[in-house]
């Protein structure tokens, strides 16, 4: 069982062995996404940082930056093939980073003008709160949900 919390500690509980491993990352943790291999964890933090962590020894394998996340919980994910880290941010953008190099591959911002909330309050910032990679490897898609109530489906 893995947990991340506002104290900035990634905790791994081994229920069978009765053990707890803790890795201190210093900034509040907002999202955890386990790798398919079971030995890595994508950790998102309020310091506008995503970290790919090695669960065996607690080392950081890669760091992803260039987005804004300082106040809200923005869920991040990895694509099905684990080639990209994807996440929204507090400016309403969707970002993707290469998981091996850590380089930003792209960022995009959808048109929120169709949202009822945006029409009522066009100057209120929109945060992309949830990002999820689609399960179909043949047609990779990403679904995002924003604070204005919109859901967008993105294709590569």
Model-derived features with residue positions:
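Conserved strand-to-loop turn within each blade of WD40 beta-propeller repeats
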Residues: 4-7, 44-47, 87-91, 145-148
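Per-blade loop-tip surfaces of WD-repeat and WD-like beta-propellers in eukaryotic adaptors/scaffolds
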Residues: 7-29, 52-62, 68, 96-114, ...
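Canonical WD40 repeat/beta-propeller blade segments in eukaryotic WD-repeat proteins
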Residues: 27-34, 70-77, 123-133
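Loop/turn segments within WD40 beta-propeller blades
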Residues: 33-39, 44, 77-83, 88, ...
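Active-site lining segments that contact anionic ligands and/or coordinate catalytic metals
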Residues: 38, 47, 71-73, 82, ...
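A surface-exposed beta-alpha-beta supersecondary segment
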Residues: 62-85
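C-terminal transmembrane module of eukaryotic multi-pass membrane proteins
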Residues: 85-94, 99
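Blade-level signature of beta-propeller repeat domains, shared across WD40, Kelch, NHL, RCC1
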Residues: 127-156
